[in-house]
Amino acid sequence: MADAAPADVKKLSFERAMEELETIVKRLEDGKVPLEESVAIYERGEALKRRCEELLRQAEARVDKITTDAQGQPVGTEPLDVQ
């Protein structure tokens, strides 16, 4: 991460949040980050993880499954049960 202020997590797209999260994981796994910075980027990583989970739940809620009649012909859609 550069010296620029990090983007607001709540405004990030799924792809951007995942990209940043992957960068944070790599930096933490490297073990070369000072303790104070490690704590700060870990906290940001947690926020990014929550954002990704939120966006995935929203996407799942929008997914429809196709319903078919007895002959297998599509007749409509209904919400996908993602439990």
Swiss-Prot record:
EC number in record: 3.1.11.6
Extent of the signal sequence: none
Organism domain of life: Bacteria
Keywords recorded for this protein, A-Z: Cytoplasm, Exonuclease, Hydrolase, Nuclease
One GO location term (cellular component): exodeoxyribonuclease VII complex
Catalyzed reactions per annotation: Exonucleolytic cleavage in either 5'- to 3'- or 3'- to 5'-direction to yield nucleoside 5'-phosphates
Record carries keyword Nuclease: yes
GO biological process: DNA catabolic process
A single GO molecular function term of this UniProt record: exodeoxyribonuclease VII activity
Location of the protein in the cell: Cytoplasm
NCBIfam families: PRK00977.1-3, PRK00977.1-4, xseB
Protein family per UniProt: Belongs to the XseB family.
Function: Bidirectionally degrades single-stranded DNA into large acid-insoluble oligonucleotides, which are then degraded further into small acid-soluble oligonucleotides.
Subunit structure: Heterooligomer composed of large and small subunits.
Record-given protein name: Exodeoxyribonuclease 7 small subunit
Gene: xseB
